[in-house]
């Protein structure tokens, strides 16, 4: 089984995705970690497997591939050299919305060459409604609908899965995290915590637990906007 991870140097992949894949415990799993950072295979493994987090077998399953995400055809020869034409290739995309369209454009061309591809896109799906509609149109025009799945990793937390559907007149959601920017300056300067957390995670949770359709029934009484406690300090060192 071949899994291609776009955004492999990101925080989500490092903290959540790779540890989960290691627990999957499949010796037949081949992971192609795709990123824009100009680092060696050794440095990438040191980054994601620090503190002895990875078994030797799991480390051997990972191959780092550097790609130029500014090119129109992101994948090109480097991807196609590793794709399997006889089996399904699995693709996980955890990137800012502006880069997803280019990747879908490349993967569409692989589909035209009869490669079997299944794609999981991590939220956010577009940075605004217009971008989301453009991505949806791109998917529909190129017959990718049956091959693409949209994911919000918050909905797969066990305590969220266990929440029952219910009626409510008021809902308060608190997300308490110990981590800050953690090197995500570029991402947060373009997306921000409001889009990263509220319009995706919080609204998806609200929709999941509501017994009734929420369309036209939500009234926002108050909202508060802030930033990570050490944002300014981390901004300086992560530039």
Model-derived features with residue positions:
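Secretory/organelle targeting and membrane-embedding segments
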Residues: 1-120, 125-239
